[in-house]
Amino acid sequence: MEIIDGHIHLVEVMAGYGRRGELRAIGDGKARWASGEIMELIPKGYGEKDFTAQSLLRLMNENNVKKAVLLQGSMYGFQNEYTYEMCKKYPERFAGAFTIDPFAKNKIELLNHFIDDLGCKIMKFEISSGGGLMGYHNKFLIDGNEMEDIWRKASEVNTTVALDIGDYTMESYQPEAIRRVALKYPNVKIVVCHLLAPIKGKEEILKRDLELLNLPNIWFDLAALPAIFSTDIYPFPSAQKSIKIAKDIVGASKLIWGSDAPMTAARDPYKNLINYINEDIFDKEEMKMVFYDNALDVYFNKH
């Protein structure tokens, strides 16, 4: 079976920033927030202080993963130029997103540079109050003034936009706003990351919001579900349950497998992040969609 990892991160230089201040690599795959909290972010053997394209390709090759979608996030720090360079170097292996801070004074200039000058066709916004923009900015609306120029530009050039909005306990969790954007800009493909970050015992919220977002131009990636249900062990039954719920509501054609490595691969073996999604959830044709076809359509067919 061919596989695309639809949600992964490169880290040339660890330069994260969030609600806990700056994040600095300290070696052995670990990084420390300004608050003093230490996180293990890079799987052993794949980088002391970084997670390069070469390390990622080795991880992919060892696990028969053909392609990967390189997304951005505040936790590692924006890696826009490095991602662009690696996509140019390995066009058959990578599709890459760029990101900007919607509060940046020169955001229009940045948008035009990445899209018009460099030809980037994917955007990623880590909105999440936990690890993203709303961790260090006041609450803003995903379809509000701060984002309007971004959505308009995305519509002009038919980009794909990936969004991490955190879980339902956070101010960043705005499925209603995503629905409004999707209806306003039907040519923009939107990927909601982490399957809305479901919480164990709150399946009715997941069902409600999947139904709300069951629109032709919205997809959901399955990245980091084993880590979100942090008390589960392989084969991650809570994650499997959430995926079955999603399949029943939006269908396999709207689901994209992703790992969210490197952090998740430091927690669990990368192969387990692939193999927990199996024939108990999807039939053979559905597996092909979730692991390859959907990501190819949403991300790679723009390149």
Language-model-derived ranges and their functions:
Residues 7-13, 164, 194:
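Histidine-centered divalent metal-coordination motifs
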Residues 47-49, 72-79, 101-108, 131-135, ...:
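Acidic-and-aromatic substrate-binding clefts and catalytic sites of carbohydrate-active enzymes
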Residues 1-6, 15-62, 66-67, 244-256, ...:
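Mid-to-C-terminal alpha-helical segments outside catalytic/metal-binding sites
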Residues 3-6, 71, 97-98, 124, ...:
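Active-site neighborhood of phospho(di)ester-bond hydrolases with catalytic His/Asp-centered motifs
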Residues 7, 60, 83, 114, ...:
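Conserved, mostly hydrophobic/aromatic
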Residues 122, 137-256:
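Catalytic pocket-lining loop regions of alpha/beta-barrel enzymes
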Residues 49-58, 104-115, 205:
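Short, acidic/polar
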Residues 66-67, 75-169, 221-225:
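Active-site gating/metal-coordination segments in enzymes
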